[in-house]
Regions:
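Acyl-donor-binding surface of acyltransferase catalytic domains
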Residues: 53-128, 153, 241-242
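A conserved beta-turn-beta hairpin within the catalytic core of GNAT-like acetyltransferases
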Residues: 40-46, 103-105, 171-179, 188
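N-terminal charged segments
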Residues: 1-71, 86
Length: 246
C-alpha cells in the first residue's frame, strides 16, 4: 500500500466521497445515508451502509426498501467489502447485484496529488463539458450531482474550441474527489487524460487538498492502469447489494 492509504479510515473516506457526490435526496438512517437522484449513478441512488443504522440490520434494510420505492429507484445498498455489516446484509436475504449497469464492484483508489500535479486546471462551465460527461440532454439530477458537493471544478481540454477531454473534481476537506474523466474517441491515445489529471491535481492542491480519491469499476482496466501510473493504489472496495426477488 502507498504511504497515504490509511490516512483516512474506510468509513471516513466513504463519507468524503459521498459529500463530494451529493444526491438529490439524502435521508439519514442512523449513520447510514439513503440516497436518490433519479437513477443517475449507482453512488447517488444507493444507501451508504457505513456505521450503525441504529436499528437491527433487517429492519434497516426494510426502511431502505421503502425509501427506494418512494423515490422510484431500485433498492440498493452500497456495502464496503469485508465490512462489519456485509454478512448481516447477506443473512437478511440481500445479494450482490451482478447486473448493476455500472458494475457490481468498484475500487476506491487514492494517491498523493503532488506525485502527478502538473499545471493548474481552469474551472470553466462549458456546454461541451456537460455534453462529454453527461450527454446531450442533461437532467436536473445530473446538474445537481455534478454541480454541487464541496468546491467543484469542471476541468477540460479543448481543440479548436471543442471540448475533447473533461473531468470533474470536488474538494472536500483534504481530499480531491475525481470523477467523469472522459476523452473523445477521436482524441484518445494522445496523453490527454494524463495531462488533464495533472492539471486537476494542481487545482486541487491550490484548494488545500493533498490526496485524490477515485471510485472506479473493477472492469475498467484502462482507467485503473492510468490511475496506477499516476501513483494511486487501492484503498478498499465496495459492492452494490439488492434484495432477493420475492
Amino acid at each position: 500500500m502507498g504511504q497515504d492509504e490509511r490516512v483516512h479510515t474506510v468509513d471516513h473516506l466513504e463519507s468524503l466521497c459521498a459529500r463530494a457526490w451529493p444526491a438529490l435526496a439524502e435521508v439519514p438512517l442512523g449513520d447510514w445515508s439513503m440516497r436518490a437522484a433519479a437513477g443517475f449513478t449507482g453512488r447517488a441512488n444507493s444507501t451508504l451502509t457505513c456505521g450503525d443504522p441504529g436499528i437491527p440490520i433487517p429492519d434497516a434494510l426494510k426502511v431502505v426498501e421503502g425509501f427506494a420505492a418512494g423515490h422510484g429507484i431500485k433498492p440498493t445498498a452500497h456495502v464496503v467489502r469485508g465490512s462489519a455489516h456485509e454478512a448481516a446484509i447477506a443473512t437478511a436475504g440481500w445479494h450482490v447485484d451482478l447486473d448493476h449497469p455500472g458494475g457490481a464492484e468498484s475500487l476506491v483508489m487514492t494517491g498523493p496529488l503532488e506525485k502527478f500535479a502538473e499545471g493548474v486546471a481552469e474551472n470553466l462551465d462549458l456546454p461541451g463539458w456537460w455534453e462529454l460527461t453527461a450527454g446531450s440532454e442533461v437532467s436536473a439530477a445530473q446538474r445537481h450531482v455534478l454541480g454541487s458537493g464541496g468546491t467543484v471544478c469542471f476541468a477540460s481540454l479543448t481543440d479548436d474550441g471543442e471540448v475533447v477531454a473533461a473531468v470533474r473534481g470536488a474538494v472536500v476537506e483534504d481530499v480531491l474527489h475525481v470523477a467523469r474523466l472522459a476523452v473523445r474517441p477521436s482524441h484518445r491515445r494522445q496523453g490527454l487524460a494524463r495531462k488533464l489529471m495533472g492539471e486537476l491535481a494542481g487545482w486541487g492542491l491550490q484548494q488545500g487538498a493533498t490526496t485524490c480519491a477515485l471510485q472506479v469499476a473493477e472492469h475498467n482496466h484502462p482507467a485503473i492502469r492510468l490511475y496506477e501510473e499516476l501513483g494511486c493504489t487501492e484503498h478498499h472496495r465496495y459492492r452494490y447489494w439488492i434484495p432477493a426477488v420475492s
